[in-house]
């Protein structure tokens, strides 16, 4: 076992900067004790005194998360002792639901902790995008959280800061408990007296300074389950004082939509008397986890879209030919599913459970606004632009200081092919799934593995099929053939966004966002996805921007393929360079057009008022596009494309 270093006391400075400026981090970081060198990669986020970066082991090429704490933030002895204790507790842990800590070292400037990389961020970002999740998803996440808590408690460790933001997700959406800054060990019946935690999750015995132990983690898990199911903390209010009062008086309400097993478990975990709360082992065995089906895996799409828990469709309504156009309507309840007997076997329980989960998924979708968040996004951008936004003298340095990479969109369009003169627009999402928005307002989407197909009628009724099941109705043959042609063309003639992937467990539950509305101007193509993301690709300099109303953030992909993500309120507070500000002003106009002129766009998407007809056949300036004479034989020469997949 490697020795824990004693954190050296940093030199005192006469003028310490109060602002949380990014630490000075060398491009090559040396762990001299182990002879290991790390290359600093992209910025991952910040919290407290720490900034996190992707670090690549120079020898093995293994990528880890590097937590960097400037020594200037560790001036006092208690600060250094606290960090040493955090590492001492965390480094001995080894469990699938605990973030793995690899090493701990320092140089003259910083202290470094290398950790398991959790590429899908945390449950906090899931919450911001989804608010409430379905009960099967809540079982999936909560059961893993409890498994991790049980492991800690068996080692006499209390986490003491269990919350959505400390529950991280890897690429397989496995929950990983992290941030052991407040963790402590207890012996026997010892009760801790420290007032610590996060307001919405603090147990009453902590507030009352009555002494606390393992039960505070159970209380926090109760709060987490409540948030997952109902979209907000049980004791949240407009003021901290009122929140604490509600916690002390156990003043909360379980919504009537809750199932009995869920409500029962929440009440047990939020019992004001700590000794009456269940242990982690008892929670693990609670009937809630057996009261309905629980997925063994979830698709990445659940970070932004409700999964499809229903079966595949077996019959369809006949469709009439509609005018060419794009969909300007909202996603509606998923009332187009087939019988529940077609559910994947790894999530099947009994009929009542399946029906309830299906209804919950439909209810979750119904809560989406009819305009797919367009008015919400317009308001956010308008408020930003109404304020006096500070200028930036050193643009690049300032921008790097307040990025919010946790707000990066889950999905964006990486390729597109416009053939709306005849069929519609084809596109590829960043995960390599492919879709088409047809001129009759119907939509089709094929997952990255080429197995799971979704068809959405112009009425927004959804149907699901397996490409290899033989159950595809003949009515869809032409559209599936066109989808394959679009897919083949983008793979063969546009710069690849990545290789295809094999299907993984849980992918059969995926509901992917689809292109809802689009149009082209002389300057850009404007795309609106069904999950609320608005994307604008500028033709002249190939800069792209994606705006998410749920995260209240904007992501730019610049000419150098760098992805830069900022919260809108940070741009207002800290400043926005002109190179981005004028694009936000343009975006406001385009969002307004998406809201007010969708009916005009739907009549003829290939001939916009400000775009000459010849533009419909012109190719945008993309390094990944080829000339018309090189087009695939099954796609006409008027197809155009633009590749925006960034190199990270």
Swiss-Prot record:
Name this polypeptide is given: Serine/threonine-protein kinase plk-1
Family stated for the protein in its record: Belongs to the protein kinase superfamily. Ser/Thr protein kinase family. CDC5/Polo subfamily.
Native source species: Caenorhabditis elegans
UniProt GO molecular function: ATP binding; protein serine kinase activity; protein serine/threonine kinase activity
Sequence intervals crossing the membrane: none
Gene this chain is encoded by: plk-1
Domain (POLO box): residue spans on this chain: 412-492, 514-596
Gene3D superfamilies found in the cross-reference section: Phosphorylase Kinase, domain 1 (3.30.200.20), POLO box domain (3.30.1120.30), Transferase(Phosphotransferase) domain 1 (1.10.510.10)
Residue ranges of every copy of the Protein kinase domain listed in the record: 38-289
Keywords: ATP-binding, Cell cycle, Cell division, Centromere, Chromosome, Cytoplasm, Cytoskeleton, Kinase, Kinetochore, Meiosis, Mitosis, Nucleotide-binding, Nucleus, Repeat, Serine/threonine-protein kinase, Transferase
Domain of life of the source: Eukaryota
Localization in the cell: Cytoplasm, Cytoskeleton, Microtubule organizing center, Centrosome; Midbody; Cytoplasm; Nucleus
